[in-house]
Amino acid sequence: MKYLVLTVRRPAFRDDVRDAHYAFLDRLRAAGALVAAGPFTDRSGGAYVLTADSLDAARELALQDPLHLERCSTVTVHEWDAR
């Protein structure tokens, strides 16, 4: 199943966390869990698509994102019937 992860910047967003976030996405990609990722053009946040066995498993992965761990962005995971 595919899951859409939305990240929305908080006022406390710090640019120094971006590299850790990109490294996190690279690890997901290497593990075969990341389908696509990218920022919003208005720089308010971004989104990525995960494959996982369940919504809980997708949330567990997404909540390891440094953007969440450092409280720089809100992270929301949605089950997504992408075609």
Each model region followed by its residue ranges:
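Conserved, structured core segments of small domains
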Residues: 1-83
